[in-house]
Regions:
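N-terminal secretory signal peptides that target proteins for export/translocation
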Residues: 1-10
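Disulfide-stabilized, aromatic/cysteine-rich ligand-recognition loop
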Residues: 31-40, 255-257, 290-376
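Bacterial N-terminal signal peptides
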Residues: 15-24
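Functional-site microenvironments in short loops/helix caps that host divalent-cation chemistry
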Residues: 101, 167-327
Length: 376
């Protein structure tokens, strides 16, 4: 069993892009300073909790309508498409949940994990699905909130969801865009994207936990790769360094795993919700866990999974764990650095999940607001 963890360093292949990013950042006009969020007595950001409540109600109302039109029957755990306002669609596949043995980097780090049912996006999120979120139609503060003079003019709550400020340079790093995975967002940006998609669709979305991601990747297998142990088959399923990839690729060109998910190995790294801890069994303090999630307590490191197009076969295994690091923002001259972009990661993306059970308002709030992003 391969157990691999790595702090990924800045790619040496893009020095000119890094220089452009720095130059563009210096030239960019200064945005309005951030306003410290108002915290309620329970510690929640008042504006973000208001939004969470509004989206939670929207989701419950939509589910009630769907149930009524389905003669009172509950929604089935089957594949479906979720259209976005931009015209892009999310292809979602069911994962019935279940149990698996979760092995860590250390010999004694073995957990028996059970997971509730969920849906996961069939492919990595593409630019077509992500860019309308990234390119906000209204001016924003560095924290992604609308500028004060705009707030009274906003008619739709979706514009109160924090969204990225303009990027310094096209985040494709000189590679192709159409049909390709969205790149270089921070975990905070990925969380806010999930909130934005939830508002649009009436379905609750979030990043997968590390356990959910690995369970979906393994697709019932207990080997390092979803296709088995034959290294000669790797090129049929994955874009990776050993396959001579020189750039990221349009998702869905390789073979899927047994559950129908594409590019779980290679192409781009994918965000999870979890803070990185070296020993998960030690963290949870027990042998069996249900729906495990290591909630963030600091900006770094978080866990990314799947490996990317530059990495070795070992680094794209189902068990491999990769840690986010401040080095990913080394080309950002802002102080504090951007909440939204990693300026040196032309191999970092995301896919998203929809749990079968709708969470509470408080749970939604915590999934979308890690509470540590301001320190990045």
């Amino acid at each position: 069993m391969i157990r691999f963890v790595r702090k990924i360093q800045t790619s040496p292949l893009f020095p000119s892009i890094v220089a452009l990013l720095c130059a563009g950042a210096v030239a960019q006009a200064e945005l309005a300073p951030d306003v410290k969020p108002a915290l309620a007595k329970d510690g929640f950001d008042e504006e973000q909790m208001r939004l969470a409540k509004a989206i939670h109600k929207r989701i419950l109302d939509y589910q009630a309508i769907k149930k009524k039109t389905n003669n009172g029957k509950a929604e089935k755990l089957i594949a479906f498409q979720d259209p976005l306002a931009s015209g892009a669609k999310l292809d979602m596949l069911p994962v019935k949940g279940g149990e698996f043995t979760w092995r860590g980097e250390k010999e004694d780090d073995i957990l028996e994990v059970s997971l509730s049912p969920f849906w996961m996006s069939k492919h990595e999120i593409t630019w077509e699905a992500y860019e309308p979120f990234m390119l906000s139609p209204i001016p924003r503060q560095k924290d992604g909130q609308p500028l004060d003079f705009m707030r009274a003019q906003i008619q739709n709550d979706i514009e109160f969801i924090a969204r990225p400020t303009p990027p310094y340079h096209p985040m494709t790093f000189g590679m192709k865009r159409d049909g390709h995975p969205a790149l270089s967002m921070t975990q905070h940006a990925a969380n806010k994207y999930c909130q934005w998609v939830s508002f649009q669709t009436g379905h609750f979305y979030r990043l997968p936990t590390e356990a959910e991601w690995e369970f979906a990747c393994r697709a019932g297998s207990d080997t390092d790769y979803s296709w088995g142990t034959d290294a000669q088959k790797a090129g049929d399923y994955a874009w990776f360094g050993g396959g001579a990839s020189t750039h990221y690729n349009v998702p869905g060109q390789k073979k899927p795993n047994a559950l129908g998910f594409y590019d779980m190995h290679g192409n781009v790294l994918e965000w999870t919700l979890d803070q990185y801890v070296p020993n998960r069994k030690e963290y949870f303090g027990k042998d069996k866990v249900h729906n495990p999630w290591v909630k963030a307590t600091k900006p770094y490191p978080h866990v990314t999974k799947g490996g990317h197009w530059q990495q070795s076969l070992q680094e794209i295994s189902a068990a491999a764990r990769h840690q986010s690091t401040p080095i990913w923002k080394v080309a950002d001259p802002q102080r504090p650095r951007s909440l939204w972009y990693h300026t040196t990661t032309p191999w970092l993306g995301l896919r998203i999940v929809r749990p079968a059970k709708i969470p509470t308002v408080e749970e939604m709030y915590h999934y979308w607001n890690s509470g540590v992003e301001a320190d990045e």
